[in-house]
Amino acid sequence: MTRHRELFHDLDAMTRLFGRWNGSLLQLSRGQLAAEAGVAQGTKLRCFQVQANQHVRTLGGADGTTCTLIPVTGPLGECYWQQRRVAAGEVILRGCDIPYDASIEPDAKVTALLVSEHRLREAHRSLMGREIAHSLSGWHSLRAAPIRVPRLLARAGEFLAASASTAVGAAVCEDACLRELVACIADGPAEIWPLASRAALVKTALEFLHSTLNRPVSSLEICQAVRANDRTLRLAFQERFDVGPVAYQRILRMHAVRKALKSRKTRSVREAAMIFGFTRLGSFAAEYRIHFGEQPSETLGSRPSGG
């Protein structure tokens, strides 16, 4: 078993904690990031626990094998999961065939347990004496018994705290987590989440915004691209991200500049800013500092020597 917990002030550094995870984190709110993240890796499952002081969007690809289960507490009920809100006391189940998409409010603590679909089905068969009654594809909201979420969180906490030096104790904690996951699935029923029209509109708009990161876009241009009126589009983005589509694209562009500044592909703040359509460098630098809590020149200076 391996276990690690660390404090972070940079989302890219926190992403690396998750190892081979094919995903990205996007800070939507303004200010210096302060986050704590922990991970425990056993022989049967992985457990992540993350809490940050900023509004963060989490995106991850489907790997075709791993399911993710997340118990929902009060604060997490205010967050968006696959463009839906979920009630406290439910358990989110993401199938291995669908990308991860969550918009997490500031200070909400996320505890996620990841296990292969094969292992989950095998454990359910062993513990319950029957196959899982429903599909594990897509996103589901599991309406488990009221005791399930606190018990699952308690077992996950024990697994995260288990010492790597006591292999037997860690294995017991891991099996206890797996047993609680099976109990949540067995409680059922599972509600499959279809993509509502407003969520589908956001998805289409995001595809357009990601394709235009080299320049700013106007509300008119976005409305024409997605064939929706301005009010509907703004409401959909405000509901999901707390900002409108134009502001959201600007955040995307700032993150793109930040990524460029950390890489060896740009030599100056000016060059990176211009690539992504920021032509007023003074205004850009001020906005960048407000959003990330540091000057763009500090980001540039923090990359490894030789960049």
Descriptions of predicted regions:
Residues 1-76:
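Generic protein-terminus/edge-of-domain signal
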Residues 1-30, 78-213, 218-220, 224-230, ...:
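Alpha-helical bundle regulatory/interaction domains
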Residues 233, 237, 283-284, 288:
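Short hydrophobic/aromatic patch on the recognition helix
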Residues 241, 249-253, 258, 289-292:
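C-terminal flanking helix
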Residues 274, 286, 292:
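Conserved glycine-rich phosphate/nucleotide-binding loop
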